[in-house]
UniProtKB/Swiss-Prot annotation:
Pfam families: Complex1_49kDa. Coiled coil: none annotated. It comes from the Eukaryota. One of its GO terms (molecular function) is oxidoreductase activity, acting on NAD(P)H, quinone or similar compound as acceptor. One of its GO terms (cellular component) is chloroplast thylakoid membrane. This is NAD(P)H-quinone oxidoreductase subunit H, chloroplastic. NDH shuttles electrons from NAD(P)H:plastoquinone, via FMN and iron-sulfur (Fe-S) centers, to quinones in the photosynthetic chain and possibly in a chloroplast respiratory chain. The immediate electron acceptor for the enzyme in this species is believed to be plastoquinone. Couples the redox reaction to proton translocation, and thus conserves the redox energy in a proton gradient.
Amino acid sequence: MTVPATRKDLMIVNMGPHHPSMHGVLRLIVTLDGEDVIDCEPILGYLHRGMEKIAENRTIVQYLPYVTRWDYLATMFTEAITVNGPEQLGNIQVPKRASYIRAILLELSRIASHLLWLGPFMADIGAQTPFFYIFRERELIYDLFEAATGMRMMHNFFRIGGVAADLPHGWIDKCLDFCDYFLTGVAEYQKFITRNPIFLERVEGVGIIGGEEALNWGLSGPMLRASGIQWDLRKVDHYECYDEFDWEVQWQNEGDSLARYLVRIREMTESIKIIQQALEGIPGGPYENLEIRRFDIDRVKDPEWNDFEYRFISKKPSPTFELSKQELYVRVEAPKGELGIFLVGDRSVFPWRWKIRPPGFINLQILPQLVKRMKLADIMTILGSIDIIMGEVDR
């Protein structure tokens, strides 16, 4: 951190790691000249749990419950990236019905993540009321998650080759009802947030990022699309079944905090369009590739597999999946940006290397540059518009 030696009246202030506006255990060392920000140094690592090293000592099946602790507000995406890697390494086909179920749950998770970004973001800039509104819709999404997966958070629902269970009876109708209701909720947000002059005063022209600058910093997700770059991995990589739906990439040219807000608000509407099309066109068939249940072929050939004693032992070994000796980078469009995994197999049931590319960690790097020469109160606005979760930043 560089502090000018000529000035004697500079103040160094610690923001966090226990401040409610830090969105987790983030610490900022801020150098102030009155109300003006001279420098800002983020201090990370308070929530580091060694997730990459844990992955290298677990099979994929054993590691699945861990990944929901990265971004604990969008756990479907961390599960999706964890099963997509082995599926591509092993050339495993996912049934069409399972792919549709995944897309529906991913978009519901995207909406839930954006909602829980919107409420605290508004609270950061002084508007407390929307915080209570967003929990009304978010609880409805969690009710749908609970009915489909058994858990409101930390679902552990995705499996290599499909999902853990089929959608329960009546779930599709309930989800369609939610979609119709939520569109009126988004219109309500537009009415009392987007057109609010005090809100516009706080976010318009604050934290501007140009398109070339966003690319140079490696930004992704709404941070990139709000700077005029139409880049969405759902369109670029053609994963799952997104090509079968009619939807548009949402983007803005301005690159400020207002643009990032507008991109996320409109993304929620696009997610509803995707969910409605998926629910109406969901095919029949299996929800899991049943051949993948045979993971360990040698064990299937072993006659002891069906022995009387094996059927009644209290603790059976978990199924294993041998990773072939090759490298693979797989990514998905998470609510915060590009969530990727660099996976190196070594003909073992354990990954030789499991490198996580978290969007929040990359997007956070531009914060010191954005807040320089801004006012102290603008730090909350800019940090809130980035949308970080420290679980995935520190891993």
